[in-house]
């Protein structure tokens, strides 16, 4: 809607809806975005959406993008919806756009894959302390997995599997 450029500081500030495309072809949509060409940082303290090269959607309350390192950082309510409609929620995230790698904490992953669902009522999910996700492997640390449907009053599922490390190999599907 409106933008200002401060030539001495090499800072571009937008007001209202703004769309930015990074060198790695990530699309940032948000408002009140600041591009600091001296510090090589793009950031916003407003709700934003990032679309990656694989069409995964990343929703953030705020973000900082380190241009030279190709890294997005965010703290707050973060949600990723992938192309298979799986949902990942985080409290903190780092995304390396060169390596196509995601590191996050306080992860809640809700899987939509029918291969997990023995019964239509199944709600496969993994909650973990942290996640490292890339094209080859997903590694959940200190995680708990269940297929069970949600229970009233946020009760624990009737069964679950816990592990210090849960590994999913995307290529081998194991």
Q: Which residues does each predicted region cover?
A:
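Structural signature for solvent-exposed beta-strand/loop edge elements and short helix-capping sites
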Residues: 1-174
